[in-house]
Amino acid sequence: MSGRKSLLLAVLLAALSGGVARAQDAPPASDMLLATLWTQRAVEYRANALAVFSLARIRLDEALVDRNWTAAPAEQSGDFQNLPPAVVLDVDETLLDNSKYQVWMMRTNQSFSTKSWNQFCAAQVSTAIPGAVEFATYADSKGVKVFYVTNRGAETEKDTRENMQRLGFPLGGNVDTFLMQAETPDWTSAKGTRRAYVARDYRILLNIGDNLGDFDDRYRTSEADRVKAFEAGMPYWGRQWLMLANPTYGSFDTAPYGHDFKKSRDEQRKSKWDVLESWMGPSP
């Protein structure tokens, strides 16, 4: 083989091997890509979050004046009008941006696991959702106790508290305002028992979250029942209850396949396609 042919062959082999390496390095396709890109990079998402927290300030001021105002209709009872004020805030994707964990899952083709999630929490790399710190400190300045009702496990409380303290969130002084999942036996992923715990001693002015489960315990039901729960809360949406957008994960994502996490990714994806309505396309 001539020297020129040998050189061309070497160049060709190098190009092919480089292409194989690039193909191997490329992250696998993921259903979460567009939603994660939006929450992490889009100014439209930031504007949406700022709008929610700006409205929250307005609603908070209204609630402080109206002593009959409560954001916990199912849990607040008796003569609550003279109780000290509080707000109930979800943490993940309401106050803290965890999109870095989503990106890690996509790049490594991993699904959510408690082990990796707790390791992410321990890294304390979550950032603040736009407007979240400012609203929490505003509420605190008004004498409103800020409770963080989160489905992070109790084992992550120290890391969560330190992460949020560093970002500037008020911590509650001598009151434990971090109400973690499984901190007590009846504090399950459904948050009603924790809202009831707060409502015993405080008038809950606002409830802010990113998932139906932050407001109503009927979140992990069928799509039809979720619609009924949403409609039952119509008097509260936009007033006592404020919702941030989170297209990356949540009970909306699992409802099409009945929240059956034993189903494969392909089965889950098929169930999602099955519930979507489509245009039939242009006429022939």
Language model segments and positions:
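C-terminal cap/substrate-recognition subdomain and adjoining C-terminal extension
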Residues: S54, G153, E157-P284
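Surface-exposed patches in mature extracellular/periplasmic domains of secreted proteins
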Residues: L64-Q76, V146-N151, G173-D176
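Second-shell loop/turn segments in exported
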Residues: W38-A49, N118-S126, F147-G153, E183-T184
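Non-catalytic pre-domain segments flanking phosphatase-related domains
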Residues: A21-L89, G258-F261, R265-D266, K270-P284
